[in-house]
Amino acid sequence: MSDYKHTLNLPETPFPMRGNLAQREPKMLKAWYEDDLYGQIRSAKKGKKTFILHDGPPYANGDIHLGHSVNKILKDIIVKSKTLSDFDSPLVPGWDCHGLPIELMVEKKVGKPGVKVTASEFREKCRAYAKKQVEGQKVDFKRLGVFADWDKPYLTMNFDFEANAIRVLGRIIEKGHLHKGAKPVHWCTDCGSALAEAEVEYQDKQSPAIDVRFIFNDQDAVVSAFDLADGHKGTGKVGTVIWTTTPWTLPANRAVAVHAELEYALVQVEDEGKQQRLILGSELVKDAMDRFGFNQFHVLGYVKGAALENLQVAHPFYDFSVPVIVAEHVTTDSGTGVVHTAPGHGQEDFVAGLEYKLEVANPVGANGVYLPDTELFAGQHVFKANASIVEVLKEHGALMHHHAITHSYPHCWRHKTPIIFRATPQWFISMDQANLRQDSLNEIKNTQWLPEWGESRIANMVEGRPDWCISRQRTWGVPIALFADKDTGAIHPNTQELIEQAAQLVEKSGIQAWYDLDPATLLGEEDAKQYMKVQDTLDVWFDSGVSHACVVDAREDLTGPADLYLEGSDQHRGWFMSSMMTSVAINGHAPYRQVLTHGFTVDENGRKMSKSLGNVISPQNVMNKLGADILRLWVASTDYTAEMTVSDEIFNRSADRYRRIRNTSRYLLANLNGFDPKTDQVAVNDMVELDKWIVGRAAQLQTEILAAYDSYQMLLVTQKLMNFCTGELGSFYLDVIKDRQYTAKSDSHARRSCQTALYHIAEAMTRWMAPIMSFTAQEIWEALPGERSDYVFTSTWYEGLQAPTNSQFSNDDWLEILTVRDEVNRLLEAARKEEVIGATLQATVNLYTGKALAAKLLALGDELRFVFLTSAVNVTEVDSQPADTQTTEIDGLYISVAATDAQKCERCWHYSADVGVEPAHPEICGRCVSNVDGEGEQRQFA
């Protein structure tokens, strides 16, 4: 028996079947950074049209988590796809470096500023800590395969950023948006000063818990708001009840709050023969009645909280009325569902009060004693006044219940004494005094929001948001570099010049320069006596929110407004909002053209990842086990606009999808063995018909994939890529061409036509994959034949995919033939199970069908057998089902399968009547003889 193996074109490639990504990727990364790949990309795209995706800064604290990975991978996919579209698309990564979390971490190590270390030393420790965190996160981001200017990131603690943030503040002042107001802060009456969050400790404290009745002014109006069960309005005064553990704040009460969507009940109560009506959260009626000791009561009707808005109630012991307002912080967790609101003594009360322009009453002095003009309680310390207030409530018939509770309460870390919330002067960006609210709403309309619901979400927030308090009493932050009049609080008339001078100092030496500054240096001796240096710092949301000015507008390689902001959906209230506010305030336009949001990662039960639940999957573990490309493929294969479910099983499924794509790519490469694109290409119109079809399909697919990338639909990209690899390409085309690839003459038209198709597909597919599976795409790129740039990332989408113009068969024709093939395969498999045949090549398939389908099948001639992977196919035109045939899913198609009587060719394994006809080759068929010793077979169709 002769060995014909050496006459076959067996597939061969150095591209391995196994990715071994966890081991291979770090080596590739090392080479990329040694080669300055990012710099090469920038050079290759210099002068091209720009696409700027501005990176929202993650907080420089702790390891990156899966949410960080999702965010950075999505950005990287978009930037790489834009680069392949021949845009110059730099990505400048950023970090948010100021604020409380870093201060808390540093405090654990060195203590609180002003105690064991000076404020200056504390800031240096914060800077060093943030720098270390940035470096740690940077390593992980790079490991993800994210391309960015990692050597020159923007940090909000960089001196130039801090200086530019101060300059933006100056421009906001210049445009008339800044004003000074009051806001409640933690206040220690023993220190006589405000406390930062970090200076607050929580300890158990016993407090009086009281239920207080407020009587409605317009009794008929409030009752008419209710949907009364039987039309009965009830009798007695109508009031509502609040529950509080801080009676001392009642002198500052300026409203009672309900929740717009909660249901409230109008309850008829009889107490010792007296009738009254009370409005309470319907879920809390039973608990409240038990607490009040009322046994006889019934509900008259119900209403949503929104219907009570703006009704007036009488203050329980002062001679004025306060409104009913709606507020988001109202719950039915405890109390009555109605909340006492004192804007001068609570953060949530303050925010709610801004919307209704409530007075921020603060009758309490710095020492915790009521001011002299405080009616009834002047001169009393607030905590000692609780008992007095309870007595006054009793006298006015307003006290419904009184008992003591022990609860967690904020205390001063120095004095270990209870603290209060007290309104103090703060700096605000006004939403209305210079039309910022309306201008922002107009710009929201001019921005494309993806998904579309983002527009209404942020618009509703802007419509309802209060003025933005931008001042913080922190140590580690950008200073509000202003000089304020010691008597009036007004800022210096030369503020614009002074801000620039302060910015220059900070640009040279960092924020410590402001704290070290002697005011007389900039103001002169006389003004320094009248004006004091503001010690407040800027809200960290201001820091990140001005990155459009400090980074996009400031760096030479970037231009604003940015084309895209991409962050989690929580950033409508956060970075998207602060960026919009500051940009509109100083520039009159939005800082972005498009805003895209992604959802959060949850486990298979829909729960957020948390250490306490033990359901955290770290990106580092996924990369170390499976590789970054698996993580990247998972991100791209998920509907990222909603919650993204993760589990080990889901990542393993992602690995399975990856293997299918890798194996398909390997098959393409292996069958390009010996192919030189310069000399061996066949023009598309000269190709075998099946090759024309697959190239045309790939060309159409590329159009669809590029459109999906342009609309940020990565899930659609991966679906189309997977469907191609498992369907038309993998299950059909690559299956059919094996015979031609392996057995045809190596340099024959039949084989070169096929190799040309494979080459075009491999060139295109590698680029389709590159934004998502970057490591694998580069690995394929290096294994492709022909001359090319060193990196797929410096190239553009493949332009060699040209649809043929002279195809004998349309795409619909081939899809119909493919459907017939599926039916043939189904019956071949049944014949194998019944042992009618062994391999499918042992079968003769007889097809009986109508005229139209028969004509298409017969047009393929003898090559139809290659499509069905059988040794013989007979097509007969019929009008009805012949005997001994089986019906199919295709109307009018009938099939029978029989074993062939022909002999098996030892080279191609087909069964043929002409095996052994050539004496020199007694074991092979005539086709193989031609391919071994002759001119080689001709293929026209398959």
From Swiss-Prot:
Record field: catalytic activity: tRNA(Ile) + L-isoleucine + ATP = L-isoleucyl-tRNA(Ile) + AMP + diphosphate
Subcellular localization: Cytoplasm
Biological processes per GO annotation: isoleucyl-tRNA aminoacylation
Record's cofactor remark: Binds 1 zinc ion per subunit.
Cofactor(s) the protein needs: Zn(2+)
Keyword set, alphabetical order: Aminoacyl-tRNA synthetase, ATP-binding, Cytoplasm, Ligase, Metal-binding, Nucleotide-binding, Protein biosynthesis, Zinc
Motif range ('KMSKS' region): 608-612
Sequence positions that bind ATP: K611
Enzyme class: ligase
GO function terms (MF aspect): aminoacyl-tRNA deacylase activity; ATP binding; isoleucine-tRNA ligase activity; tRNA binding; zinc ion binding
Task performed by this protein: Catalyzes the attachment of isoleucine to tRNA(Ile). As IleRS can inadvertently accommodate and process structurally similar amino acids such as valine, to avoid such errors it has two additional distinct tRNA(Ile)-dependent editing activities. One activity is designated as 'pretransfer' editing and involves the hydrolysis of activated Val-AMP. The other activity is designated 'posttransfer' editing and involves deacylation of mischarged Val-tRNA(Ile).
Assembly description: Monomer.
Family the UniProt entry places it in: Belongs to the class-I aminoacyl-tRNA synthetase family. IleS type 1 subfamily.
Protein name from the UniProt record: Isoleucine--tRNA ligase
